[in-house]
Amino acid sequence: MKAQLFTLLAAAAVGTGTVQARGEYAEIARLRSMNETVRGIRSMADGEHYTILEGNNIVRYGYATAGQGEQMLPKPTANLVVTDYAFSPDERQILIASGARPIYRHSYTTDYFLASGNSLMPVLREAEAPRDASFSPDGKLIAYSDRNDLYVYDTAGKRTRRITDDGAWNSVIN
């Protein structure tokens, strides 16, 4: 009788462990199948805020606070369609890509705007087909490509300097 009781208890314990292990495995498999990143959220340098593109505006939220976010752009502009954006290293300026025109696969040219304080102004206007613009580490310059040549735009002096002159379509890509 004791042997049968012991066998019954041992079988129940082993069975419970198997069911529990299956449940844990199912939970692990479920978690692994989830996305590994959260698209659209960009963490800010202070570690306390993040931004999201909502409609045609960039909105800043706090991780620890709920509620309405702070709009980062001065005011909506009719000809501005925000397709991408990047903050300067000090996060005082925002480089905005607007109106992407596809080239091939994931490549595109676009118009660029610079938001700083309460102003929003077009930049890189003399460029024929600007693309891949980004801030320099000090935030004073914007580097970009135009017709496969590299350029640097000075945000303070509003002047462009050509860096390369050997770019050619489908031949030399700088």
Identify the role of each PLM range:
Residues 1-6:
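Bacterial N-terminal signal peptides that target proteins for export
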Residues 8-18:
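Hydrophobic h-region of N-terminal signal peptides that target proteins for export
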Residues 17-174:
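Beta-propeller folds
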